[in-house]
């Protein structure tokens, strides 16, 4: 590995890590929001 490539390597590692974290957060928030929405809707449905 030449010294010129090392910073790019670290940047790629950082970028991929960031993307993975972002995707995980998106999936978790999507699941969490759908769960909350389902609870809310079922509560409204049952209270009628």
Curated annotation (Swiss-Prot):
Major location category of this protein: membrane
Pfam family, one: Fun_ATP-synt_8
Statement: the UniProt record of this protein carries the keyword Transmembrane: yes
InterPro entries: ATP_synth_su8_fun
Keyword hit for Lipid metabolism: no
GO biological processes: proton motive force-driven ATP synthesis
Listed GO CC annotations: proton-transporting ATP synthase complex
Subcellular location: Membrane
Entry keyword set: Membrane, Transmembrane, Transmembrane helix
GO molecular function terms listed in the Swiss-Prot or TrEMBL record: proton transmembrane transporter activity
Membrane topology: Single-pass membrane protein
Residues annotated as transmembrane: 17-37
Family: Belongs to the ATPase protein 8 family.
Name of the protein in question: Putative ATP synthase protein 8-like protein
